């Protein structure tokens, strides 16, 4: 079970050809600003999408990637992939909400990006256009993160160009 990262990069196309606006994929518990090395309990949730048919199994799945830090499973409903991403497993595809853990990187100067892809299915056991998927991007900045500002060389280059432009105007 589970969604591979390669499959999920273009969406969950085995379930539907394009993302569905009626399906919300959310990652809660992620701090806007993280502290280095701290463990954060996160919840992946799907809302909307197709109604589950008479069979309440096979309701959905997800794939979560982080650009830094470590994602890990906290129960038997998710699994860690070799590339460091997390996904649901066969036990975890009978639901639309999962608990996971993220350990923030030791470097608190980073801006960490998260990509969450999820699919909500109708439970009929058939991959079809009736199943929906969507994706969302999230970020968390380290407590030591600093927005990039123009460096001195950039400022000097701009000043030089302005000086040349002004000098040329004065010659005419």
Predicted segments with their positions:
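Short acidic DE-rich linear segments
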Residues: 147-150, 171-172
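Sequence context surrounding c-type heme c attachment/ligation sites in exported
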Residues: 1-148
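A cross-kingdom C-terminal cell-surface attachment/processing module
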Residues: 153-169
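Positively charged, low-complexity intrinsically disordered regions
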Residues: 89, 168-172
């Amino acid at each position: 079970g589970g969604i591979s990262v390669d499959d999920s990069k273009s969406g969950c196309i085995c379930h539907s050809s394009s993302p569905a606006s009626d399906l919300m994929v959310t990652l809660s518990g992620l701090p806007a600003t993280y502290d280095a090395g701290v463990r954060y309990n996160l919840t992946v949730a799907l809302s909307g999408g197709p109604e589950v048919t008479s069979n309440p199994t096979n309701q959905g799945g997800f794939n979560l990637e982080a650009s830094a830090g470590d994602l890990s499973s906290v129960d038997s409903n998710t699994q860690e992939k070799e590339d460091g991403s997390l996904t649901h497993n066969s036990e975890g595809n009978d639901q639309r909400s999962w608990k996971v853990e993220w350990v923030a990187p030791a470097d608190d100067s980073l801006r960490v990006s998260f990509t969450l892809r999820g699919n909500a299915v109708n439970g009929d056991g058939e991959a079809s256009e009736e199943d929906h998927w969507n994706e969302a991007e999230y970020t968390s900045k380290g407590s030591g993160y600093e927005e990039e500002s123009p460096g001195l060389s950039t400022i000097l280059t701009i000043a030089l160009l302005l000086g040349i432009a002004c000098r040329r105007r004065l010659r005419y």
